[in-house]
Amino acid sequence: MSRAPLDPRSPIPAPYRTGERDAIQEMARSFAMNKVLPVANRLDPEHGLIPDELRQEMGELGFFGIMAPERYGGLELGVFEYALVTEELSRAWMSVASIIARSGMALVLNPAQREKYLPLAVRGEWLGCFAMSEPGAGSDIASVRTRAAKVDGGWLLNGQKMWCTFADQADCILVVARNKPYDPDRRHSGIRQFAVHKASGTFPEGVSGNPIKKIGYHGWRTFELSFDDCFVPDDCLVGSERAETAADAGFKRAAAAMTTPRIHTAARSIGLARGALEDSIAYVQQREQFGRPIGDFQVTRFKIANMASEIEACRALMYQVAANADAGEKCDMSGAMVKYLASEMSERVTSEALQIHGGAGYTTDFPIERYWRDARLTKIFEGTSEIMQRIISDHLLPPTPLR
C-alpha cells in the first residue's frame, strides 16, 4: 500500500511547544515561502538588494522586534522564538534571515539613544551595522588597531574595518576601537564600542567605504570602511567610562554579545540545510534515470536519510541552547557548540543536495547553489569553526600556554 511521504519539517518538540510558538513558526514559514523565496530566486542571481517593501512587511509582522521590550513596540519574546523565525526565513534567503538582527543594535545604545531609536528599530526603520574586524584582526579581536582619541565633546576615530555588511544602508555603525594605544602585554585593554549615527544610503563625514565582491550572501552589500578623523560625540560611547572600570570591560562586552548571534547563525545554518533537503526530496521524485525516479535508488534514499538526521540533531541542540539562554543560563560553550555543529552540517548537507541535483545543481536555475554558497559562509562569520573549537576546548581543558 502506498503512502504519502512525511513532511520533512519537524514540529517543535513537546517540551518547548506552545500555541504561540506554533503560530509564530507558521507565520514566518508562510511569509518565507510566499514572499521571500520568489524574491530571492529573482534577485540573488543578479546580486539585487533586499527590497524596501519586503523589509517594511517584515517590520509590520514584528520580525525586527522579536526580543525587544513591549514598551518600545517589540514582542518581548526570547531567543527561542528568534531562532524559530530565523530558521524559516533562512530556508528562503539567508540575507533576509540576517537583516532582522540589525535592529538589535539599538538595545546596546545608551538609555537616551535607546529611547529614541529602539521604537524605530522594531519596525525596521532604523537598522545597524557592526564594524569589528580589521585587515589584521579577524578571529583575533584583541588585536584591533582602530583608535579613538579623546577630544572636546567626543572622540575621533581613525583606522580601517573589514566585512561591514549593510554599512551603506544602515542608520548606525557600531565601531569597536581602542581608546588607549595598543599594548601587546595588555591586548584586551582599552577596547570600547562607539555608535556612529548616519543617514541611510550615505557615509558620514570622516568615513569612506569600498564594496567587497563576494561569492554569496547577496541582497545587501559588504564594505571595507576607512575612518579618518570621524567625530563621535561623547554620548555615543557605548557604556560610560565611569561604569566600566575594568581595563578589559569593552572587550568582554563585545565577546559576551556573541552568544545570541551564534544561536542565530545556527538557525540560519539549519534553515539553509532544510531548504536544500526539501528541494532535494522534491527533485528526486521528479528526476528519472534508468527508467525510474532517482528517489527509488538506495544511494539517493540514504543521502536523504543522512541529511534529515543531521538537520534534526542540530535543531534539537539549537532548541536546547536557546531555551537555556532564555532561562538566563550561561551559554558560552553550548552556543559555540551549536554554531560549530550546525554550520559544519549545513555545508555538508547543501553540498550533498547539489550532488543529488547533478549538473542542474551547478546552475542558477535551482536555488541549491545559493544555499550551498551561503552555507559555506556560516563556518566563517560570527566566529570561525576553528575559533568555536577553541572556545569549547578552553572550557573543557586547562589553559594552554600557547596564547
Regions found by a protein language model. Give the residues of each.
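Glycine-rich phosphate/cofactor-binding loops in nucleotide/flavin-utilizing enzymes
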Residues: S2-P13, L84-V85, A101, A247, ...
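Glycine-rich beta->alpha junctions and the first turn(s) of the following alpha-helix
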Residues: P13-E20, I24, V207-E312, T378, ...
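A short, Trp-centered hydrophobic/proline-enriched beta-strand micro-motif
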Residues: G124-M132, V176
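C-terminal helix-coil-helix/basic helical segment that borders enzyme active sites and/or dimer interfaces
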Residues: L37-E46, I281, Q285-R292, A308-L341, ...
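Glycine-rich phosphate/pyrophosphate-binding beta-alpha loops
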Residues: M162-D168, P261, L377-T384
